[in-house]
A protein has these predicted regions:
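ATP/NTP phosphate-donor binding region
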Residues: 1-66, 107-122, 133-143
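Short glycine-rich anion-binding loops that position phosphate/pyrophosphate groups of nucleotides
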Residues: 14, 73-75, 98, 185
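Short glycine/serine/threonine-rich phosphate/pyrophosphate-binding segments
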Residues: 18-19, 74-79, 187-193
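Proline-centered loop/turn at the N-terminus of a beta-strand
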Residues: 35, 87-91, 207
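Gly/Ser-rich helix-loop-strand patches that form or flank binding pockets
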Residues: 83-96, 100
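Catalytic core of DAGKc-family lipid kinases
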Residues: 98-177
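ATP/nucleoside-binding phosphotransfer catalytic cores, i.e., glycine-rich phosphate-binding loops
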Residues: 151, 167-170, 219-321
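Gly/Ser/Thr-rich active-site loops/lids in small-molecule metabolic enzymes
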Residues: 159, 169-217
């Protein structure tokens, strides 16, 4: 056993398929001399006798060269909670539906493990969001998000009254279901469902998308990654608390009068990639977008006839005969 190489497995143990694939992956990694580590909350279901068991804490991936995830985007977001502080790359094997964050599919498990064994992958960094909640100048919560952070109403029968600020200047006030702030990575998730734009991952920006706003000016915003977006939850006679959701997983109660500040995170999340396909191709594949009829520039150029020498070098019509 090569004691210097360790892979942390994070598994959606609620899926029997994921458990069986995790066992197969552990066997292959063990045969290659790579130690396997699992989270204590998943250890009983996985029943891997040779695996090291650790708590699901911020240092769970310490000493691991990669975090291999078997599940959907939700499982990958969960794995980011244990991989971010140690800057360990995450490699997702999609067992869910869209699986936008995943790098491979269930049928490619053997090839994926081969990439891990031979270290044939690149690592890209994805920006995150840092979120701070204050009330009367006192910090009441700190959170972070890889995909998005949303401030939403906590009661169905009430609207959330908010004022949005960008870089210290008030922008607009509205009532509605709330607002979602997103990274480019999260632009294909909640923000997309709320009507926000898709932003290519190499573009650094922060998105702010209103949720069912009752206002004339309530449009999706795209601001600089250096900007700070602040959302103030207004107080009025029947105002109820809001709820801050980060990546749809971690929640904080936000009382009326609170201020939520969203800025670029100090720690990015690292994703392992071994497919060099353009992001456009990933969009087409994941969303099953219709592209039939596309000819493409290269294909058109190949069909263009070669110009004759006379056409390439036309005579000077102004020249004397």
């Amino acid at each position: 056993m090569n004691q210097d190489r360790t892979v942390l497995l994070v598994v959606h143990t609620g899926r029997p398929e994921a458990v069986s694939l995790a066992r197969a992956a552990a066997d292959r990694l063990h045969d290659a001399g790579i130690r396997v580590r699992v989270l204590r909350s998943e250890a009983d279901e996985l029943a891997l006798a040779s695996a090291e068991v650790v708590e699901a804490s911020g240092d769970a991936a310490a000493g691991c060269e990669i975090v291999m995830v078997l599940g959907g985007d939700g499982t990958i977001l969960r794995s980011a909670e244990v991989a971010r502080t140690t800057r360990t790359p995450i490699l997702g094997v999609n067992l869910g539906h869209v699986g936008f964050l995943a790098e491979s599919e269930r049928d490619d498990l053997a090839a994926t493990i081969d990439h891990v064994v031979h270290r044939r992958y690149a690592v890209e960094e994805r920006m995150t969001l840092d979120v701070t909640v204050t009330l009367d100048g006192v910090v009441t919560a700190r959170q972070w998000a890889l995909n998005d952070a949303s401030l939403e109403k906590s009661a169905r029968e009430r609207m959330l009254e908010i004022v949005v600020e960008v870089d210290g200047r008030p922008l607009s006030r509205w009532g509605g279901d709330g607002i979602v702030a997103s990274t480019p990575t999260g632009s294909t998730a909640y923000a997309f469902s709320a009507g926000g734009p898709i932003v290519w991952p190499e573009v650094e920006a922060i998105l702010a998308v209103p949720l069912s706003a009752h206002a004339l000016f309530a449009r999706p915003l795209v601001v600089s990654p250096r900007s700070v977006i602040a959302v103030e939850l207004l107080q009025h006679y029947n105002a109820g608390p809001g709820v801050l959701w980060c990546d749809g997983r971690r929640t904080e109660s936000v009382p009326p009068g609170s201020r939520v500040e969203i800025r670029r995170g100090d720690l990015p999340v690292r994703l392992a990639r071994f497919h060099q396909a353009p992001f456009t191709d990933r969009l087409v594949r994941k969303f099953d977008l219709p592209v039939h009829g596309w000819r493409g520039r290269v294909r058109r150029e190949r069909r263009e006839p070669e110009l004759s020498a006379d056409l390439r070098n036309p005579p000077d019509v102004d020249a004397a005969p």
